[in-house]
């Protein structure tokens, strides 16, 4: 693990430890975030900690053409129970995601600093959101970083206040991204939920080829 000063670049991701932890910084900025995503690195830390940067191996990814839609989701997709929008309520989505704990982690990792910097990237059209509505209520959503020049979407977090709402939003987003020519969706780390949607683990070196 390396401590990186604000003026320094990240070390090679091959220097990450066995858990994927690569570096620690005191700074978080839009420029630092963009450097990270283009190198296959993402931030994940708790409030009160320094910024921890990760590049796990293997890497959980979804190839859009491999999306799995369970039979139980068909009624949701064929009816009007939920409606989906894109980039309409980014701030509300990241706020709601901040109230959801990540698996195996106490507290939220979406700190005020995270919200501030991702909102700046949203204003630049780089951080994007998907909103799921039930009538006028925001019941689910997700956000991430869209590297359009690489045809890669980096998912960050999702939330759900109604059964299957976040899954509905994820499916709709993947379908949209596939139409736009996206080759890969970065899901970061393994979860059984993501696996059920068609995501798989690949070697980090294979993942990085999509960012070259």
From Swiss-Prot:
GO terms for cellular component: cytoplasm. One of its GO terms (biological process) is protein catabolic process. It comes from the Bacteria. Transmembrane segments: none annotated. One of its GO terms (molecular function) is leucyl-tRNA--protein transferase activity. Keywords: Acyltransferase, Cytoplasm, Transferase. Belongs to the L/F-transferase family. It is found in: Cytoplasm. Functions in the N-end rule pathway of protein degradation where it conjugates Leu, Phe and, less efficiently, Met from aminoacyl-tRNAs to the N-termini of proteins containing an N-terminal arginine or lysine. It comes from Christiangramia forsetii (strain DSM 17595 / CGMCC 1.15422 / KT0803). The gene is aat. It catalyses: N-terminal L-lysyl-[protein] + L-leucyl-tRNA(Leu) = N-terminal L-leucyl-L-lysyl-[protein] + tRNA(Leu) + H(+); N-terminal L-arginyl-[protein] + L-leucyl-tRNA(Leu) = N-terminal L-leucyl-L-arginyl-[protein] + tRNA(Leu) + H(+); L-phenylalanyl-tRNA(Phe) + an N-terminal L-alpha-aminoacyl-[protein] = an N-terminal L-phenylalanyl-L-alpha-aminoacyl-[protein] + tRNA(Phe). This is Leucyl/phenylalanyl-tRNA--protein transferase. Its EC number is 2.3.2.6.
């Amino acid at each position: 693990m390396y401590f990186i000063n604000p003026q320094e670049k990240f070390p090679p991701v091959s220097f990450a430890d066995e858990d994927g932890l690569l570096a620690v910084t005191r700074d978080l900025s839009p420029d630092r975030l963009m450097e990270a995503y283009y190198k296959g690195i993402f931030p994940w830390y708790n409030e009160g900690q320094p910024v921890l940067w990760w590049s796990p191996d293997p890497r959980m990814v979804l190839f859009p053409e491999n999306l799995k839609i369970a039979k139980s989701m068909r009624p949701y997709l064929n009816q009007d129970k939920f409606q989906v929008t894109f980039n309409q309520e980014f701030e509300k989505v990241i706020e709601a995601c901040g109230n959801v704990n990540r698996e195996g982690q106490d507290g939220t990792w979406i700190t005020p600093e995270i919200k501030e910097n991702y909102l700046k990237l949203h204003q630049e059209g780089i951080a994007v959101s998907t909103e799921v509505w039930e009538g006028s209520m925001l019941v689910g959503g997700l956000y991430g970083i869209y590297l359009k020049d690489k045809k890669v979407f980096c998912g960050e977090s999702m939330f759900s206040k109604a059964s299957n709402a976040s899954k509905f939003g994820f499916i709709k987003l993947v379908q949209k991204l596939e139409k736009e020519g996206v080759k890969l969706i970065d899901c970061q780390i393994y979860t059984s939920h993501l696996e059920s949607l068609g995501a798989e683990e690949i070697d980090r070196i294979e993942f990085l080829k999509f960012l070259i």
